[in-house]
């Protein structure tokens, strides 16, 4: 599938940086709040608990982003899906859905693992009120298939992703909020995989093969 819009490398990099900063600004801000509480000399235990939980949250988000958006090694490198599972599990400890991962641990090309992690973010966006998000890895290391099934209240395919996936030119320019759906489809194109969407009243299934 050809994307209906093309971003320059400079714009893509800048927008992804904005997206990552948006993801970590909340836990980093909470760390700062905890430090201010300590400086004021009140509620030391509460302040330390806030600092610790926020630091773990920020670390989990950065570790996830390192693989999902970053180089994570040299060009052409393969990534262990076990590492992807670990960073995803830690990331979703701070999110609403119940998260499960099923599938054999294999080495896959970097762009395919990046695609998988970005599909998790799309799935998470489909259940804004929480629910469950289940990942299943099928096929082989040479011909993998990813299946992400989400269930929950207010199910809906994220509008920006649906718009870009349909092949229609977006009504508004790609910004820091819509760059992740764009990047997901770009990764699928680079990896030679096709993303399919199957939505019912009970669940939404995103698959790539």
UniProtKB/Swiss-Prot annotation:
GO CC annotations on file: cytoplasm
UniProt note: phenotype after gene disruption: This gene cannot be deleted or disrupted in the absence of a complementary copy expressed in trans, indicating this gene is essential in B.abortus.
Location in the cell: Cytoplasm
Keyword Kinase: yes
Coiled-coil features, chain-numbered ranges: none
Protein name in UniProt: Protein phosphotransferase ChpT
Quaternary structure and interacting proteins, as annotated: Homodimer. Forms an asymmetric heterotetramer with CtrA (2:2). There are at least two modes of interaction between ChpT and CtrA, only one of which is competent to catalyze His-Asp phosphoryl transfer.
Any one biological process term the GO annotation gives: phosphorelay signal transduction system
Entry's free-text remark on domains: Each ChpT monomer is composed of an N-terminal dimerization and histidine phosphotransfer (DHp) domain and a C-terminal domain that is structurally similar to the catalytic and ATP-binding domain found in histidine kinases but that lacks regions required for ATP binding.
Consequence the record notes for mutating residue 22 to A: Loss of phosphoryl transfer from CckA-P to ChpT
